[in-house]
Amino acid sequence: MSLLTNYEGLRHQIERLVRENEELKKLVRLIRENHELKSAIKTQAGGLGISGFTSGLGEATAGLSSRQNNGVFLPPSPAVANERVLEEVGIMALAPLAEMLTSLQPSATPGSLMSPLTGTLSTLLSGPAPTSQSSPLTSFLTSPIAGPLTGTLASSLGLPSTGTLTPSSLVAGPVAMSQSSPLIAPVMGTVAVSLSSPLLSSTATPPGVSQNLLANPMSNLVLPEAPRLRLAEPLRGGPTGPQSPACVVPTATTKVPLSTEPPQSTQDPEPLSMAFAGAPLQTSTPIGAMGTPAPKTAFSFNTSDTQAQPSAAQEQVVPASVPTSPTTSPTVTVLASAPALAPQVATSYTPSSTTHIAQGAPHPPSRMHNSPTQNLPVPHCPPHNAHSPPRTSSSPASVNDSRGPRTTEPSTKSMMEVERKLAHRKTSKFPENPRESKQLAWERLVGEIAFQLDRRILSSIFPERVRLYGFTVSNIPEKIIQASLNPSDHKLDEKLCQRLTQRYVSVMNRLQSLGYNGRVHPALTEQLVNAYGILRERPELAASEGGPYTVDFLQRVVVETVHPGMLADALLLLSCLSQLAHDDGKPMFIW
């Protein structure tokens, strides 16, 4: 009798489970319809340019379909929280039934009373063993909705979460997240970062967001992008050393003749510039031409003072093979070469080109010279003929192919002062070609427009930061996350994060109304800066035509300078800069 009673009770439980299963399936259909409806609404809202910000606690990512075109998310509706509560309650209600069915299964006999649902539920709810997808409840629990259910159940029971944090997992409960993430590990207590936040989206990114963000955005926070720097900034106070190729500004230089004769310097109409493709020079006492060849160095050198004295005739002669370390003095120590070295160096004079010094075959070790060379001062004698033939040298010297024993580092301040003095003397003694000077100045104005636009966008979002090293328009979302972290406990300051994000969205909405595309124009600004350079002195000092820069004047500069294929985008950048300057009431060029 007791066995029949148990069977009867079990049959009622199974029937109740079947009814609950039907109700759960209806709930799943409603949830799916709700998700599809929200996805459609978000897609339409993204097409209309509607933006918002969400920083909800425990928000789960809804997949690619929930992202808007501009990468900004709408806040979740209250129905989402109710759905999670229902899902959690449904799983908690099935747990005791699974335990009872597991305990009764060995003593039960096969019959019509034992529905296949019992075994399925017992297997499904008793452990992580793989189950068949044919059961309706199994398919429900293994559907995309089941991802948050598992994490929610573990969190509600107070169990520690040992799995890694992925974009599809739900951050809920006290601490239910992976401790291996560099950003999420400090986020404790009630603070939980939503992985569907617009700051971490990877596919439909907001305007200005880099397109190479990975699917797991946590790993992208430690991948800084190459910053854009002014060429003169390392001379103001930064450490000296090899310059990055990203900072090289294309300039016009002079082919420097290299021979055994002290040449009279050739006149170069281009302004002073120095762009290193390798490493700087090293000043040392020559030991002689060694048999071991030094590394090849290719650099462009442009002098601003073009006269030379007989005692200082070797100023512009550059060694064919020089050690790569910083110099000591403002001027470059030049070593006269042996006659065999003359064919190894390009000596033709070609304006607007770079001087490539190639190292030829090394001299035999037996040829050793001990004649000292001196560090030559900047010449101050009257100018000579710009293209007169070189005269014969009377002091032999040798090429230093190895590192000298004495090296010191230059003072960045003295280097910058010498550079300014040389540029001033050149403009006063040797007037440049007006047409070439105007073209070079206008090209730098175009690059300055692009640079100032990026600087204005960044300063609008991070006004409290004086230095923006490493900040670009493309990595603004990552920098917002970094700026929102508390340096003491590394917790996310949600209020600060929301305030910075609102500034970012506001600036991008203003620029989008002018035609600015956050996925196209940040890269274009970098291209313009690298192609045309930037101003090398304060804008008020570099202003031409008797007054400050105006929009009309800058439009004429852009039209006459930029290639026709990029002209429309360059004019758009100028209009965006003018609009931002009008909004904050500051000059267009902020130094």
UniProtKB/Swiss-Prot annotation:
Residue stretches in coiled coil: 1-42
UniProt entry tagged with the keyword Coiled coil: yes
Sequence ranges of Low complexity compositional bias: 317-331
Transmembrane segments: none
GO cellular component: centrosome; cytoplasm
Superkingdom per UniProt: Eukaryota
Similarity comment: family membership: Belongs to the speriolin family.
Protein name according to UniProt: Speriolin
Species per Swiss-Prot/TrEMBL record: Homo sapiens (Human)
Gene: SPATC1
